């Protein structure tokens, strides 16, 4: 019976992941920042903001590191530090935990983001592309992945998932994107030509477990649907599924003034495809945006 250790296990992605894992013959320990009790016999919580939390962790086979402050807040100077440190410090704490243990994890799955890649209207990015940090978000991703790769020195297989925009009803981008359409105000953002590399949350959870269970899977994987859309087409598809018009336009300048540096998530984007996932014979349930939105939008 495998024992999973999950950070970020109470968040949008982590909650769905826990539901999927617990259907198999597995135990789960979830690291949290507050005291929690479990009603499930195979799920336990450890508050790792308390002293000596390490003593409560049993032998672990698989580590899934999803910890990190949300990007969906205004990026003030202090909050940017929170975004960075919440990821770096959590990953370092995990490494130090297992560095001092005889029983090492077989696999580490570490979350990351497509913000690693430079914004480009014309380039299609695969996992083969390598670059150095060029803005705040890419610096966060670069440092986070660097910390995760330390686990390779323990003999642990490391899988890094660069997540695209995760579509879910329970949080993330979709509820915020749908809100203007609910009020008949949806439309083009900026040029509308920027790419939205997205993935349905069910496919993300399935792909994550697929890479964990595929022994040949290691290194970086792009967690995006194979069919990427421009923002204008994304919005048009969302409008059709929502039975609302797609007719307004918000200039780039207005978005940058309203969101500050966080506007890069909306305007400065990349076309990212999941070559390595598909090479491992992973089959998407929602490869097409319309199918994904029809499942999520009610």
From Swiss-Prot:
Gene3D superfamilies recorded: NAD(P)-binding Rossmann-like Domain (3.40.50.720)
SUPFAM superfamilies tied to this protein: NAD(P)-binding Rossmann-fold domains (SSF51735)
Superkingdom in the source lineage: Bacteria
InterPro entries to which the protein is assigned, alphabetical: DUF1731, Epimerase_deHydtase, NAD(P)-bd_dom_sf, SDR39U1
Similarity remark: Belongs to the NAD(P)-dependent epimerase/dehydratase family. SDR39U1 subfamily.
Name by which UniProt lists this protein: Epimerase family protein SSP1921
Source organism (scientific name): Staphylococcus saprophyticus subsp. saprophyticus (strain ATCC 15305 / DSM 20229 / NCIMB 8711 / NCTC 7292 / S-41)
């Amino acid at each position: 019976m495998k024992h999973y250790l999950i950070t970020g296990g109470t968040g949008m992605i982590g909650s769905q992941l826990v539901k999927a894992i617990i259907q198999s013959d597995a135990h789960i320990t979830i690291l949290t920042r507050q005291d929690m009790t479990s009603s499930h016999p195979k799920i336990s919580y450890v508050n790792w903001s308390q002293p000596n939390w390490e003593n409560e962790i049993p032998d672990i086979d698989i580590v899934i590191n999803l910890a990190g402050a949300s990007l969906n807040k205004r990026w003030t100077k202090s909050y940017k530090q929170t975004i960075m440190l919440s990821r770096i410090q959590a990953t370092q704490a995990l490494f130090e935990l297992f560095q001092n243990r005889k029983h090492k994890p077989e696999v580490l799955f570490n979350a990351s983001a497509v913000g690693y890649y430079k914004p480009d209207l014309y380039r299609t990015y695969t996992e083969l592309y390598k670059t150095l940090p060029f803005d705040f978000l890419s610096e966060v991703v670069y440092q986070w992945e660097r910390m995760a790769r330390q686990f390779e020195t323990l003999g642990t297989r490391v899988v890094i998932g660069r997540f695209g925009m995760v579509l879910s009803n329970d949080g993330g981008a979709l509820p915020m994107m749908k809100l203007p359409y609910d009020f008949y105000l949806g439309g083009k953002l900026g040029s509308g030509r920027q790419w939205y590399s997205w993935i349905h949350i069910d496919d993300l959870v399935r792909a994550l477990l697929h890479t964990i269970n595929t022994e040949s899977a290691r290194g970086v994987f792009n967690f995006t649907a194979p069919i990427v859309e421009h923002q204008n087409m994304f919005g048009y598809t969302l409008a059709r599924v929502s039975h609302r018009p797609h007719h307004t336009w918000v200039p780039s300048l207005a978005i940058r003034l309203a969101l500050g540096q966080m506007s890069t998530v909306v305007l400065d984007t990349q076309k990212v495809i999941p070559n390595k996932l598909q090479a491992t014979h992973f089959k998407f349930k929602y490869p097409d945006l319309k199918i994904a939105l029809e499942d999520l939008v009610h």
